[in-house]
């Protein structure tokens, strides 16, 4: 029914336009008999030369003689327009009455076509939303436009990254060198440099030299491989043997003399040397 309503409105608009064109092409001729008329009824019978504007402000219906033709044309145009609208409405009603089934069928076809096109329109809209410009790689752009550090040497490589700092390679190389080097000393104790321990060759006789050397190597191996066990063993010995040992007149756990220079030694080494001297 909505389609039929739209058809009726379109017919009304066409009829009104055609009626207006007919009125403009064929204006109605009014006989110039020297009288003023309105709607076919004679209001006043006065000559045009006598008619003029009333000076009384309360008389709102005064008519000037020069506007009679415009008033007649206006009334005739309104009458013709009303007649054209009446005819158009009558024709539309007749069409809707006689061809009502056809109008309903056409409106149903239009709605069906729209429903069939609706999924296609949704797909097109979804594709339009999915197609987006490729985002710019911010990290790559930052590397390309970064200002190089003149203090660091650079090496060009065939990767996406334009430059790689050479000091990174040097750092990895130095790390490998340290890992494959000898025994690393992570922590140090500071003892006076004048506190020197006697060498095993001077103290031990020839028969005990090899035994002491093997013991020293074993202690060093344990200190490298199992530092936690050595530390626990040393602390246990300190609890079982609380007596202080004297070396050259100084106590082992005495506070160091700050006036003497300090020499770094590995952890637990003073206790190892004290134990060895005690065994002798």
UniProtKB/Swiss-Prot annotation:
GO terms for cellular component: extracellular region; host cell nucleus. Residues 229-249 are annotated as: Disordered. A motif (RxLR-dEER) lies at residues 49-70. It is found in: Secreted; Host nucleus. Residues 1-19 form the signal peptide. The RxLR-dEER motif acts to carry the protein into the host cell cytoplasm through binding to cell surface phosphatidylinositol-3-phosphate. Belongs to the RxLR effector family. Secreted effector that completely suppresses the host cell death induced by cell death-inducing proteins. This is Secreted RxLR effector protein 39. It comes from Plasmopara viticola.
């Amino acid at each position: 029914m909505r389609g039929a309503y739209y058809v009726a409105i379109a017919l009304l608009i066409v009829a009104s336009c055609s009626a207006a064109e007919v009125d403009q092409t064929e204006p109605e001729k009014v006989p110039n008999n020297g009288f003023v008329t309105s709607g076919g009824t004679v209001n006043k019978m006065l000559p045009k030369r006598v008619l003029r504007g009333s000076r009384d402000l309360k008389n709102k219906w005064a008519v000037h003689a020069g506007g009679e033709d415009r008033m007649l044309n206006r009334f005739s145009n309104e009458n013709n327009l009303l007649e054209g609208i009446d005819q158009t409405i009558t024709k539309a009603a007749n069409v809707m009455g006689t061809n009502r089934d056809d109008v309903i069928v056409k409106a149903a076809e239009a709605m069906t076509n729209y429903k069939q096109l609706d999924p296609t329109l949704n797909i097109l809209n979804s594709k339009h939303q999915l197609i987006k410009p490729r985002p710019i790689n911010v990290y790559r752009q930052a590397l390309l436009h970064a200002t190089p550090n003149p203090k660091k040497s650079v090496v060009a490589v065939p990767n996406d990254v334009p430059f790689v700092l050479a000091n990174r390679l040097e750092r990895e190389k130095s790390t490998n060198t340290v890992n494959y080097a000898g025994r690393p000393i992570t922590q140090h104790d500071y003892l006076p440099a004048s506190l020197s321990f006697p060498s095993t060759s001077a103290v031990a006789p020839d028969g005990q030299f090899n035994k002491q050397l093997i013991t020293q190597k074993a202690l060093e191996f344990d200190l490298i491989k199992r530092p936690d066990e050595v530390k626990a063993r040393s602390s246990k010995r300190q609890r079982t043997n609380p007596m202080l040992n004297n070396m050259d007149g100084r106590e082992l756990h005495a506070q160091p003399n700050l006036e003497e220079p300090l020499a770094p030694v590995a952890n637990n080494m003073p206790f190892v040397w004290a134990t060895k001297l005690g065994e002798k």
